[in-house]
Amino acid sequence: MRGSVFGFVPSFRIRFFASSTHIIDTMKTLQEYLSASHAPEDLGKIIMMIADQAGPIRSAFISNQNYAGSTNSSGEDQAEMDTWADTRITSVLQESGLVRSIASEEQEDITEMSPSAKYSVVMDPLDGSSLIKVNLTVGTIVGIYEGDVLQAGNKLRAAFYMLYGPLTTLTISLGNGVSIFAMNEEGTYVLLKENVRIPEGTLCGSGGLRPEWTEKHIQYMNAIECEGGKNRYSGSFVADFHQILEYGGVYAYPATKKSASGKLRLVFEINPIGFLAVQAGGAVSNGESSTLEIVPTKVHQRTPVYVGSKGMIAKIEAIR
């Protein structure tokens, strides 16, 4: 049997998957999960509104595979899908009246929306968008704060990402563990796995060109390779992290000789993913201490990142 062309999973396949692997005992939708978690009503609505954009975003891949001829605030070329997904999600949140402000990797500044609203959203609308042309996995990364945008990652009320691969999945935490859902053929997110934990593993993926690595990072990667570490790096942060979440190991985008701040953005990428990692029993660090404790001073602030199994993160912090 096959899923639909958009990567949805027929509900009968999910039931078989759940019963045959004993991952879950009963079926639960994302909406039911939010209710059972006692998520505040407005927070739950914001999560569902963004989650519901996965189908339209994935459907738009076919007709939006080129570059848009523009750059984002970080100076990176924008793919058509970057701007399409950003506009789509921003418009939905603007119309809802439930969001105070939004910060997106594809927007130069924080966009103010409804001043009386309780929550603010940070997002990378389409992480890894350059991989769409070669049909590799990409995703949408989201964090939600109570109050304003520029807060430490440990203040997040919710973090999740949608992954557009063979399945369309949503991995989420409200601060009480991590759960993974998959979209079925009806567009409903059904629970695949709950209480997800990052095992100690040997997968490793590192960004940056090797000649530009610092001595500290070279020492770290050499040690991993000597211990049998297996390299996994696709160019999509969210896809590479999902492998680490499942199998254990570390994803790194370190400080380099050219950029002491690394490449990834603290607000849109590192904080939501780091929050999920910690909720799954893992850790996140800039190589010295937790990135979740950093209070950003600007929306496009960058920082080096190591995220994954606790043991892997302890090793990089131990190198002086």
Curated annotation (Swiss-Prot):
PROSITE patterns: FBPASE
Catalytic reaction annotation: beta-D-fructose 1,6-bisphosphate + H2O = beta-D-fructose 6-phosphate + phosphate
CDD domains xrefs: FBPase (cd00354)
Subcellular location: Cytoplasm
Protein name as it appears in the record: Fructose-1,6-bisphosphatase class 1
GO CC annotations, alphabetized: cytoplasm
Entry superkingdom: Archaea
Primary localization: cytoplasm
